[in-house]
């Protein structure tokens, strides 16, 4: 019995029980080792003309014996001598593959891709096996050698027999464990089934470059006997057939010109379990200091659980065609969590078990490039296939808005131009850039209204007032919309016609254009303004003068109305935004009525101490109702002022989609007027 060199049983226990968290990856590791062995022989044949090799014969074979409780992984690769068995398997964490890569670094070409690097993958076999036997015959040698160990104390190496070069790794599986206190137990029998092994091969090693073969059970109809009568019923028989389980060449490593869209669609649907074709397919290859392939998909519709806390984002991460992580969330920002796909790179730094990644600059560089590619593709869809983009935005636009809101506006530069909102003027979805291009020359802000439906917003007096002045209003109907705009604060519109400070500068520019010069453009910072909040600064000088005069003349009326309404409003004032309606509710400060409603819709309602919107009751001084208020004030009719104040406030709330605090009293007041 030979002892494991330099490392103790404690270290082996660490390898088996601590490094790996998922026992089923033992098959991935052993198949990767077999692939490396075949790669080494393939490389040797390229360097040494005397090595005669038929590429079509190179393969890996997996088999099992349920009665003997064994799984065998065989390859016809380069094999190992007794010395190599001693060095590679007798010394824990010694990687023959890493040594091979180092020794042949300058000679290796694109035809060899060694997977192993740490020298511990082989020992994952002891997670499921009570005994491991390795039979190996090195290429060019006449004698095979057998390495055996139970993973406890040491190992033996003896002479053996094998018909040709290559290696057999034979695992004797552990017995099933007994139920623990939680009623759980590891059942190793699951690895002793055809379906169990096939599914593991296809999950983790589907794109290993060599055929992974298994004898599989099939059924076929027996030949019909020549003397069979009319009442003959077909008979069937079971048989075994050698079948290649893996796909070998991954679709993301094929040249784009060699793959049809239908092939991408089928790969997407089968891999990511979707019934619909993807809306977009993004395939690219990166070279340089960091080399990788990426194949990304934008789904045609949102997964049912996309916005639930249980949804997991991430791309499948492969290293040298071997699956490392099914969902690597570090490769996608949260606002692109809907993207599905694959990244394959041999350059990312893995941890020793290859189950997870080490935090490294390579991964961040890949993620940054992936993000840019997704953004560019979405921009292309927005500009060249608007119908498809609007459908995409209907499915996934909420996430883009959350990307801006959750980053406190830091991601606005990347995402703002991907957003779409309904234009009250154009009656269609438009981008912020399109809104800016359609503005009158004197417009200095982007106007919006927030609520639960476009139909209701379009009828709001404050919206109509802005539209009547010739300015468009964006109608925001998702709960995150206004929070997103508040996080952005402004939108920088690029290549806008330059605004000149004085007539002389403007006239000089106009003359230059007339003489053939290009019109001057500038980036314009446009504030995002809620039409129901604050001063929109849209009134003309004459309108401002009229409002000031009306305010001064009716200070006593406004004071009486404020007293009647109490702390429901901050103040009562003359409106500069109304044209037809008698009154409206606006707000001062950062919290609008709509934002207050959204916060109150939370699972526990409005939290204690949550600030409320600072409401203002604005009156249209040109409306007949205002004249009645003035008359009541002059007559000293405080009861009527109180009644009218309550009615105007409650009807303004109804227009905003908010029920009066006392609907019964409101109905009674309306009936009394009738």
Q: What is each residue range found by the language model?
A:
Residues 114, 132-154, 174-179, 183-674:
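GHKL/Bergerat-fold ATPase module in large chromosome/replication-associated machines
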Residues 1-187, 191, 199, 222:
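GHKL (Bergerat-fold) ATPase N-terminal catalytic module, capturing the glycine-rich phosphate-binding loop
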């Amino acid at each position: 019995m030979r002892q494991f060199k330099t490392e103790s049983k404690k270290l082996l226990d660490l390898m088996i029980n601590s490094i790996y968290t998922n026992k089923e990856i033992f098959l991935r590791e052993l198949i990767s080792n077999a692939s490396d062995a075949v790669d080494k022989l393939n490389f040797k044949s390229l360097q040494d003309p005397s090595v005669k090799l038929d590429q079509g014969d190179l393969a890996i074979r997996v088999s099992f014996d349920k009665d003997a409780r064994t799984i065998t992984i065989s390859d016809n690769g380069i094999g190992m001598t007794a010395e190599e068995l001693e060095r590679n398997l007798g010394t824990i964490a010694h990687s023959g593959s890493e040594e091979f890569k180092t020794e042949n670094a300058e000679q290796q070409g694109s035809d060899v891709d060694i997977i192993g690097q740490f020298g511990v993958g082989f020992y994952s076999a002891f997670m499921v096996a009570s005994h491991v036997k390795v039979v190996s015959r090195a290429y060019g040698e006449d004698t095979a050698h057998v390495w055996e160990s139970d993973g406890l104390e040491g190992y033996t190496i003896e002479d053996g027999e094998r018909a040709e070069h290559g290696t057999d790794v034979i695992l004797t599986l552990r017995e099933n464990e007994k139920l623990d206190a939680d009623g759980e137990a590891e059942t190793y029998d699951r690895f002793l089934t055809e379906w169990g092994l096939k599914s593991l091969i296809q999950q983790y090693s589907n794109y290993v470059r060599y055929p992974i073969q298994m004898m599989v059970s099939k059924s076929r109809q027996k030949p019909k006997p020549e003397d069979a009568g009319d009442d003959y019923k077909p008979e069937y028989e079971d048989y075994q057939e050698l079948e290649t389980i893996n796909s070998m060449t991954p679709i993301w490593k094929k040249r784009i010109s060699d793959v049809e869209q239908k092939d991408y669609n089928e790969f997407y649907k089968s891999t990511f379990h979707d019934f619909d074709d993807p809306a977009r397919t993004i395939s690219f290859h990166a070279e340089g200091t960091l080399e990788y392939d990426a194949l990304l998909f934008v789904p045609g519709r949102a997964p049912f659980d996309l916005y639930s806390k249980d949804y997991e984002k991430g791309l499948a991460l492969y290293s040298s065609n071997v699956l490392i992580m099914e969902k690597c969330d570090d490769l996608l920002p949260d606002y692109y969590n809907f993207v599905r796909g694959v990244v394959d790179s041999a350059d990312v730094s893995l941890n020793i078990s290859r189950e997870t990644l080490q935090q490294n600059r390579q991964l961040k560089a890949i993620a940054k490039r992936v993000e840019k590619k997704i953004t560019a593709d979405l921009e292309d869809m927005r500009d060249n296939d608007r119908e498809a983009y609007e459908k995409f935005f209907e499915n996934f636009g909420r996430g883009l808005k959350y990307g801006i809101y959750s980053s406190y506006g830091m991601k606005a530069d990347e995402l703002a131009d991907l957003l779409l909102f309904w234009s009250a003027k154009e009656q269609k979805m438009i981008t912020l850039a399109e809104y800016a291009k359609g503005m009158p020359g004197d417009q200095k802000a982007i106007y919006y209204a927030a609520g639960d439906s476009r139909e209701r917003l379009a009828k709001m007096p404050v919206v109509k007032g802005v539209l009547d002045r010739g300015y468009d209003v964006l109608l925001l109907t998702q709960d995150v919309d206004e929070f997103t705009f508040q996080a952005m604060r402004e939108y920088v519109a690029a290549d806008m016609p330059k605004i000149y400070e004085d007539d002389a500068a403007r006239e000089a520019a106009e003359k230059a254009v007339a003489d053939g010069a290009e019109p001057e453009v500038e980036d314009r910072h446009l504030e995002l303004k809620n039409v129901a909040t604050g001063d929109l600064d849209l009134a003309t000088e004459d309108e401002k003068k009229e409002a000031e005069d009306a305010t001064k003349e009716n200070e006593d009326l406004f004071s009486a109305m404020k007293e009647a309404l109490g702390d429901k409003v901050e103040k009562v004032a003359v409106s500069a935004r109304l044209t037809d309606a008698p009154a409206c509710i606006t707000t001062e400060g950062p919290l609008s009525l709509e934002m207050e409603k959204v916060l109150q819709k939370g699972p526990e309602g409005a939290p204690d101490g949550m600030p409320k919107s600072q409401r203002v009751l604005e009156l249209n001084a040109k409306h007949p109702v205002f004249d009645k208020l003035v008359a009541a004030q002059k007559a000293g009719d405080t009861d009527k002022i109180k009644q009218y104040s309550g009615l105007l406030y409650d009807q303004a709330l109804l227009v905003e989609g908010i029920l009066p605090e006392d609907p019964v009293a409101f109905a009674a007041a309306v009936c009394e007027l009738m």
